[in-house]
């Protein structure tokens, strides 16, 4: 643990004894006497009436076989949701012998956690994301934080947009430079309701006075501008971030994007706004924006892509490595990344399921040899073939294809057309925009035919950004078979396309 710019940063990826402890703390239990694994478990069952992460100092020495037996009991216990970290004489002497100020916390976690049960992964994007698990995205984070950086952030579900915004807030808000940062979730809110919620959040954060609460963006931006001119209680930089902003942006089009123009007017070295969403509506409606002579096309966009192999590998292996889990070879890692489509949220889901498998017959591991826990092809298939896991993967990939449903549902239509083309003539080269239009004409999909080639091309680019499609120089294929399999066989694809004949909504 170390402080930088007034904030605490943790050197290990374990939230239980890192960021979670900032609010929840943790319990320290000191035990003397002769304690074998069974006696220890009896004691932990008794104190577990108050569920809390716990460090146990045991004034005794455990043999390796006892330690491994204790590890199995902890991991298989169904009632423990928190971490019990055991430090006995052997481990304590080891840490003392190899003491290093910069490495001691990492060393403790890496030596004790393989013998504990710990679940650090949070695949649900709506939940609080532990900063210790934040992986890669350094350039994207800087563009969000910088006064001269991006204003419009977009990308699909499970790609970590909310985690990026919250990481920016954590690094900026209340730092030693007198900066503030606020994240406001405006999911499903139109511009008046969004203004109300933003003003309330700024009041709650002590940035604006209670009298500043309003539902008018013109009034709200004047309040913000005056607040930044206050020299008695200065804010040297305010970063305002709106998450889940698709409906907000869409509603702004009815009044020529006036709220976004108002925010743009007060943007300076002391203030920046960021709007995150799943779909770049301003770029998609470029003609409308240009025709209204609005300077929004000059706002810098930032696309959040799925991970590349190095980032995906780090997220998959780093925290698990502290828990004593190793992968048999690079092929095993590649299979997992492909199955999860390189989506950070799905990679975390796999890690979560891998750890949960320990609670069922120790995931088939031999107690006398573990830890370490080597993930073999057998363990890989056990998780990947689990019906519950695959259903969750299907649901989350389905969400990705329907992420623009409120703006027309074009992703799903295009995906179905490319699947139809695949079943007609399998081709690694892919399918062109002209071929996509041809199928749309055949099936009378008016919703897609009303779009210009430029707009369809924009959608294809976005689907490539989401790693749904791959671009082969102007022709498009599914990036992985996961999405094609999600859509079904040729008959199922044809039946789904039939739902879009004419102007009808999906059945």
Which residue stretches match the model-derived regions?
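Conserved P-loop NTPase "ATPase switch" module shared by AAA+ and STAND
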Residues: 13-38, 54-63, 227-256, 479
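Conserved Walker B catalytic segment
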Residues: 39-47, 67-78, 218-281, 285-295, ...
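Conserved catalytic segments around the Walker B and adjacent sensor/switch elements
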Residues: 54-57, 174-190
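Walker A/P-loop-proximal flanking segment of P-loop NTPase domains
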Residues: 104-156, 167, 171
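Winged-helix-like regulatory helical subdomains adjacent to P-loop NTPase cores
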Residues: 129-136, 170, 329, 342, ...
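P-loop NTPase Walker A phosphate-binding motif
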Residues: 153-183
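Conserved NTP-binding/hydrolysis module of P-loop NTPases
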Residues: 181-212
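Conserved small helical "lid"/interfacial subdomain of P-loop NTPases
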Residues: 302-332, 350
């Amino acid at each position: 643990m170390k402080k930088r710019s007034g904030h605490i940063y943790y050197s290990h990826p374990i939230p239980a004894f890192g960021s979670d402890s900032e609010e929840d703390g943790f319990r320290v239990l000191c035990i003397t006497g002769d304690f074998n694994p069974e006696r220890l478990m009896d004691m932990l069952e008794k104190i577990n009436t108050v569920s809390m992460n716990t460090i146990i100092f045991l004034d005794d020495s455990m043999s390796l076989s006892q330690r491994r037996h204790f590890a199995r009991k902890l991991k298989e216990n169904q009632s423990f949701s928190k971490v019990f970290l055991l430090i006995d004489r052997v481990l304590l002497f080891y840490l003392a012998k190899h003491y290093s100020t910069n490495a001691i916390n990492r060393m403790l976690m890496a030596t004790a956690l393989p013998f504990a049960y710990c679940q650090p992964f949070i695949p649900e994007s709506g939940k609080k994301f532990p900063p210790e698990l934040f992986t890669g995205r350094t350039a994207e984070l800087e563009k969000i934080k910088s006064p001269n950086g991006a204003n419009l952030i977009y990308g699909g579900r499970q790609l970590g947009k909310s985690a990026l915004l919250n990481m920016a807030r954590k690094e900026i808000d209340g730092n030693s430079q007198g900066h503030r940062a606020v994240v406001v979730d405006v999911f499903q809110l139109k511009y008046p309701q969004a203004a109300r919620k933003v003003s309330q959040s700024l009041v709650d954060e002590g940035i604006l006075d209670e009298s500043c609460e309003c539902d008018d963006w013109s009034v709200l931006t004047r309040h913000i501008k005056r607040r930044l001119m206050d020299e008695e209680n200065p804010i040297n930089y305010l970063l305002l971030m709106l998450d889940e902003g698709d409906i907000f942006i869409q509603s702004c089009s009815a009044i020529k994007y006036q709220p976004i123009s108002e925010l743009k007017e007060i943007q300076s070295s002391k203030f920046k706004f960021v709007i995150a969403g799943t779909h770049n509506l301003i770029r998609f409606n470029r003609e409308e924006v240009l025709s209204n002579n609005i300077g929004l096309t000059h706002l810098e966009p930032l696309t959040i892509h799925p991970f590349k192999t190095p980032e995906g590998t780090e997220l998959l292996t780093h925290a698990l490595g502290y828990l004593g889990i190793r992968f048999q070879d690079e092929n095993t890692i590649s299979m997992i990344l492909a199955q999860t489509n390189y989506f950070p949220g799905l990679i975390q889901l796999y890690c979560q399921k891998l750890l949960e498998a320990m609670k069922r017959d120790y995931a088939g591991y031999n107690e006398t040899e573990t830890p370490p826990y080597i993930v073999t092809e057998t363990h890989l298939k056990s998780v990947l073939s689990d019906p519950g896991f695959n259903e969750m993967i299907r649901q989350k990939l389905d969400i990705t294809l329907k992420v623009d449903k409120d703006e027309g549902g074009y992703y799903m239509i295009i995906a179905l057309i490319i699947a139809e083309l695949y079943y007609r003539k399998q081709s690694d080269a892919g399918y062109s925009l002209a071929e996509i239009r041809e199928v749309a004409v055949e099936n009378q999909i008016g919703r897609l035919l009303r779009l210009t080639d430029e707009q369809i091309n924009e959608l294809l680019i976005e689907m490539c950004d989401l790693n749904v499609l791959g671009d082969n120089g102007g022709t498009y294929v599914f990036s992985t078979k996961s999405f094609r399999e999600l859509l079904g066989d040729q008959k199922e694809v044809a039946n789904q396309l039939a739902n879009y004949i004419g102007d009808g909504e999906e059945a």
